[in-house]
Amino acid sequence: MAETNAKRFIKCYNMIDNALRIQGDMRRSISYTEAVRRAARTNGLVKKYEDQLIDYGRLRNAIVHSSNDEFIIAEPHLEVVEDYEKIANLICTPPLAINTICNKNFKSLTAEVKLKEVMEFMFKTGISSIPIYKDDMLIGVAHANKITKILGKMIYEKKDLEKYISETNIEDVLKILMEDNYYTIAEQSITLDRVLSLFEENRKLLLIVITKTGSLLEHPIGIVSVGDIMDINKILDNYA
């Protein structure tokens, strides 16, 4: 026998209520509405659906009598139930970047490689972001836009461009970019909503390098760039 709309709705309510309390380490004495408001401060998905979640919490109280989920006194519309189920899936089992948007078509290079080789590699492969390692530790990311700005400055200052790109190690180029804060590292469990939050929190951020545990001593398993934001939003909008 198929579940009623009310049963499905109550199941979503309980799933979200439990997930928010576990994720935010909140006491059971805190109300559902307060749990939503607190979670919205740090969880991008909860923030996006904050008003709907609160409205659905109030609707739950109209569907059942008091705290007894079995005593149903009203049936919600199917469209409402399906919308609540979608939000519940996003919050309780959020899609991971590594399984969806993450770019796994990349290559890392070592610190002693000359800038000229890096640029040639970017041109041949079309890859614009290359993690750079020294002694098996990530020391930076060679990014096409950042390199272009450095070379543009050299042209403006009428410096010997050919000599610079032929003789300079990529490690020395990265030292110039150390304070730009244009990339960060994350573990493989990072969710799409967290990816969006990172880009929102740091407007200079161009890419996120993903490793198994988020350690600089691990080689990357994927990269997410700021250009993926539109696709991330589409995935979240259609996630069910």
What function would you assign to each model-found segment?
Residues A2-S29:
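Hydrophobic alpha-helical packing segments in soluble, helical-rich domains
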Residues E85-N105, H143-L205, S225-A240:
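Tandem CBS (Bateman) regulatory domains
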Residues A40-P95:
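Charge-enriched, short contiguous segments at helix-coil
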Residues E112-M119, L196:
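Short amphipathic alpha-helical segments
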Residues M122-K124, I130-I147, F199-R203, L207-I229:
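A glycine-centered beta-loop-beta connector
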Residues R58-E75, E79, F123-K158:
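Acidic (E/D-rich), amphipathic helical modules within compact regulatory domains
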Residues I22-K48:
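Short, charged amphipathic alpha-helical segments flanked by flexible coils
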Residues M1-E3, L96-A97:
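Charged alpha-helical initiation segments
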